[in-house]
Amino acid sequence: MKVIFMKADLNLIKTLHPLEIKVIVNNEEEDDISASIIIEKLGFNEGQANKTIEWLNSKGIIEEIYRKLNVFYKATERGLGALRDGFVEEKIINLVSQKAVLASNLALELDIDVKEVRKAFGNLLKEGILSLDLDKQIIINCLDGTETNYQKVRVLLERAKNSDLLRESLTTEELLLISNFAKKKGADSVFFKIIEKLDLKFRLSSFGLEVKNFLMKSKLTGDELTKLTPEILKNKTYENKKFRAYNIHIPSAKTFIGRANSYLDYISKIKDKLVGLGFQEFDGPLVETEFFNNDALFMPQFHPSRDIKDVYYISDPSMQESLPEPYFSNVKLAHETGYATGSRGWRYSFSEDLSKRLVLRTHGTVLSAKQLINAKNPSRYFGVIRCFRYDQVDATHGVDFYQTEGIVIEDGVSIKTLLGLLEIFAKELAGATEIKYVPAYFPFTEPSIEIHVKHPVLGWFELGGSGIFRPEVTKPLGIDLPVIAWGIGIDRMALMHLGLNDLRDLFTYDIGDVILRRGKIDAKVRNL
């Protein structure tokens, strides 16, 4: 019978991959086709076998005849470690059989993680192998020779050490037991990992048989050359060989080129806006002394925000050798007596060692304090600064974040000037339509103001803090003019401006999600 193909079919046949051709011409109508069979029969590796089956199935050359999901239990490193080093249950029994042990001292005696010991000890109590007397001392009960659960798990691990355990090969009792020690995800913490493998079998379809006849008549074997290289030309290995046909009408693969990150682009636009308003940019190191991070800002050394629970301290080196004079002495006096400000200060004994400690900067105002030393009159400065705080991560908080920090040093600046700048941040840069100013307290500003904005999903939240620097901040650093200052969370501004509901979306690794919202975000950033 003469086989007649449509033009589209001929194009498909001519562009078959050599691996596909090998599978087609080496299988008969009744032959089963699967990845394992191809590997054994044709010498493909696993990747080649799976990919070839996927190609052939998508083209209708083979058709599925069998499908089954097999579940296996694979011994994890933790399980093999228990097999090698002993189960915690075994170690508990060995210890208790040698000496009297209180339940509360068990983890300490074994030098094993408390959670692991509690779990193993609980299992032994549940099985009745151990019990407690009135003094909470552990007692080993008489065993009747019955195999314990951990001994049964040991047997299963011994079997799984050589080959994965197929669920169907396990008894009902073994399945119930192994389910307590197995996970599909996060299996590092258990003895077995659950692995699912789909067993698929195919056969040549009617179309596939026609394709095979065409290939056989065309004397195509899958050994055809796929590319023309200098070596082939030089050695003339192309002689008596056929080349694989190429379909020039097939669209080329999509190229994903690098593009500007929308969030970094947003930060760049903020910088452009502030420079356009006459500000100069400043920057500084991530690691700062407590002196500039807190002391120079008139934050007392007993302030709760300086606690180790809120700050990342540097362990090596832990302290800076010296601090700049006369500013250190001036700040010390400001804390102890108020310096020349009319204030009485905080009235405590100021510690130089504490002031020298190194920390990851917790706020951008640290750079404003450093800038005051060299500031001109009048002047405007800003920075886009990465800050670090020990915080609980949620939709509006992160352990590291960007702030835009700034100061204006000028005769005549006032709260009115500050409110105008804050409105620019909230409305023009963050895109907020509803804002409010809330009285606040910061040790380094008086008066102090927080600006809050209303998010359509998250509701009201703080965008940042601001105020006029206290004389106890400015005078010890050589400034006798009023200074307005602010620290605004750029991450939160971006949350508003880019239409997101969670700070973590700014740093997502989900490329699909980024691509879906890129057009909308890029348009908003361009319109800043």
UniProtKB/Swiss-Prot annotation:
What GO CC terms are in its UniProt record? cytoplasm
Mind listing the UniProt keywords for this protein, alphabetically? Aminoacyl-tRNA synthetase, ATP-binding, Cytoplasm, Ligase, Magnesium, Metal-binding, Nucleotide-binding, Protein biosynthesis
Q: Which InterPro entries match?
A: aa-tRNA-synth_II, aa-tRNA-synth_II/BPL/LPL, Phe-tRNA-synth_IIc_asu, Phe_tRNA_ligase_alpha_bac/arc, Phenylalanyl-tRNA_Synthase
Q: Which GO terms describe its molecular function?
A: ATP binding; magnesium ion binding; phenylalanine-tRNA ligase activity; tRNA binding
- Signal peptide annotation: none
Enzyme Commission number, as recorded: 6.1.1.20
Q: Which reaction does it catalyse?
A: tRNA(Phe) + L-phenylalanine + ATP = L-phenylalanyl-tRNA(Phe) + AMP + diphosphate + H(+)
Q: Name one Pfam family in it.
A: tRNA-synt_2d
UniProt cofactor note: Binds 2 magnesium ions per tetramer.
- Residues reported in the UniProt entry to bind Mg(2+): E446
Which family does the similarity line name?
Belongs to the class-II aminoacyl-tRNA synthetase family. Phe-tRNA synthetase alpha subunit type 2 subfamily.
Report what the protein is called.
Answer: Phenylalanine--tRNA ligase alpha subunit
- The organism encoding this protein is Borreliella burgdorferi (strain ATCC 35210 / DSM 4680 / CIP 102532 / B31)
